[in-house]
Amino acid sequence: MTDAFKQQIQAEARQAVEELLEQAKLKKGDVFVVGCSSSEIVGGHIGKDSSLEAAQAVYAGIAPVLAQRGIWLAAQCCEHLNRAIIMEREAAEQYGWEEVCVVPRPHAGGSWATTCWKQFKAPIAVEEIRAHAGIDIGGTLIGMHLRRVAVPVRLSLSKIGEANILCARTRPKLIGGERAKYTEE
């Protein structure tokens, strides 16, 4: 992988997370889930062409932006680990999410989860979370880890590298019927 392509991936990842955060209105302590197929980023087929370099470039683009705002990064593993989440122990404890025992590797968990495991201060795996927003890079199906109600968010870019991206924020359920008043549009 060329340095130019790594820089492109990093810049696109940073731009995507910044645009989504602008629309999602997350606050300090919220959780942001990222599912990332490094295979799709480099133009391969999901699960077949894992790239630590691509995953590291995504991490370099996303992690500092979230850390600056005090937002927790949750990294979704691949389907071989049942799409478990890698996150900081402190975040899991804050939300009461139960730890499971596994250490991701590029071909069992994915390069993205492996990269995050190596970068986090005190990484743990959890089976399921309810994130406040997230980015799906390359068709990784993050919906199972989003709070209800998920709201699609369109960004100015539609790809990171060669991978399609889909983004979502969440909002509380609107209840009460026609006489109710809501604070959100």
Annotate each predicted stretch with a short phrase:
Residues 41-46, 50-57, 64-83, 108:
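Active-site histidine-anchored catalytic micro-motif
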Residues 18, 22-25, 63-71, 117-125, ...:
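Generic secondary-structure signature for well-ordered alpha-helical cores
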Residues 69-131, 138:
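Ligand-binding beta-strand-loop-alpha-helix segment within the catalytic cores
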Residues 1-32, 52-65:
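N-terminal glycine-/serine-/threonine-rich phosphate-binding loop
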Residues 30-35, 73-74:
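Short glycine-rich phosphate-binding loop at a beta-alpha junction
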